[in-house]
């Protein structure tokens, strides 16, 4: 019985820690989030965070669609000059950045205004590489609100001046939010231990 009480106490403490971190990240980011294109300040580069274009059932992923819509809206409103698409390209026939590039071009974004980061395996990699590889100390992150909050939190830790534009949310996202609780806790630990991207590499100039 004593061991059970200790186990339950540890589980309760872990749950409280995860809950606290989740809401701390939200609090830290709240003044840097925008949902109105007319109100968001201008930045040279918008960092479009990658996601799979299709769901497991073969339908277009709404997270993808709404991020694409958001990036196009910002560019056409003159709020960003370039779009840096950062995503995963680590598996055969899976290429988040190129999918976005093709669809951005189809929506009227000039190809020379789009840069691709194929080593954005996770949000931490994408944010740090935007600074260390692509030379951006100020960025506009483009994703859904919950994702933007974590990206802003990471950017702040690495002295990157970041704001974010919230893409349209997706309904029925309980599983995504549960994952976000864990992702924020992992990000918190990563920052404590100064975890760096899997790859850095040569500098790339956006111009």
Language model features by range: what are they?
Residues 1-5, 174, 178-181:
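Structural motif marking the loop-to-transmembrane transition
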Residues 1-38:
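N-terminal type II signal-anchor transmembrane helix
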Residues 10-12, 74, 191-193:
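Enrichment for repetitive, rod-forming helical segments
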Residues 177-196:
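A transmembrane-helix-recognition feature enriched in membrane-embedded lipid enzymes
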């Amino acid at each position: 019985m004593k061991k059970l009480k200790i186990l339950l106490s540890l589980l309760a403490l872990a749950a409280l820690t995860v809950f606290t971190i989740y809401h701390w990240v939200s609090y830290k980011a709240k003044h840097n989030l925008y949902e109105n294109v007319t109100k968001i300040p201008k930045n040279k580069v918008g960092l479009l965070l990658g996601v799979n274009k299709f769901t497991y059932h073969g339908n277009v992923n709404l997270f993808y669609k709404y991020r694409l819509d958001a990036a196009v809206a910002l560019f056409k409103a003159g709020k960003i000059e370039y779009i840096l698409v950062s995503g995963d390209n680590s598996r055969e026939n899976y290429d988040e950045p190129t999918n976005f590039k093709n669809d951005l071009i189809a929506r009227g974004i000039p190809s020379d205004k789009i840069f691709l980061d194929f080593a954005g395996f996770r949000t931490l990699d994408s944010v740090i590489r935007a600074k260390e590889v692509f030379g951006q100390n100020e960025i506009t992150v483009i994703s859904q609100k919950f994702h933007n909050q974590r990206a802003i939190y990471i950017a702040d830790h690495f002295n990157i001046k970041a704001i974010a534009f919230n893409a349209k949310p997706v309904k029925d996202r309980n599983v995504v939010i549960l994952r976000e609780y864990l992702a924020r806790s992992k990000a918190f630990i990563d920052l404590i231990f100064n975890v760096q991207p899997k790859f850095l590499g040569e500098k790339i100039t956006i111009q």
